[in-house]
């Protein structure tokens, strides 16, 4: 793995948070960058779910879950899989409609968004390649 330390923790596809083992923490330069407690994904998921339950309206729960999504995709999808019937209306419809309506007020992180312009269709492929981190051919 090329990424280490904060760079690794900043990658939501690689970040496991407190689920990194002691060996992984040492090898990946994470010693001291995470709380010392080592947890399983099951323990993390239980904690995240309990924290989400304490949130108020659906939009607050969605914002919280999207924050988890932005930090740790493994954990997000693990929790989502465990509670799919309950979380689907929060992450998707109908709460996403409210989220879209309030987009300007709650814009926090573009979640690696690719911005496409209807006025420049010739840029679509270049934009999508850039967003995916793929070099042009």
List each language-model region with its residue ranges.
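Metallocofactor- and cofactor-centric catalytic cores in central/energy metabolism, strongly enriched
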Residues: 1-137
């Amino acid at each position: 793995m090329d990424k280490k330390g904060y760079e690794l923790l900043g990658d939501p596809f690689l970040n496991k948070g407190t689920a990194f083992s002691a060996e992984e923490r040492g090898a990946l330069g994470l010693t001291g960058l995470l709380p010392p407690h080592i947890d399983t994904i099951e323990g993390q998921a239980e904690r995240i779910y309990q924290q989400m339950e304490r949130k108020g309206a659906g939009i607050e729960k969605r914002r919280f879950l999207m924050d988890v999504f932005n930090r740790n995709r493994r954990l997000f999808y693990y929790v989502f899989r465990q509670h799919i019937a309950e979380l689907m209306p929060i992450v998707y419809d109908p709460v996403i409609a409210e989220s879209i309506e309030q987009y300007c007020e709650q814009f926090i992180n573009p979640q690696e968004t690719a911005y496409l312009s209807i006025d420049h269709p010739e840029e679509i492929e270049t934009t999508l390649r850039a967003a995916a981190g793929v070099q042009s051919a």
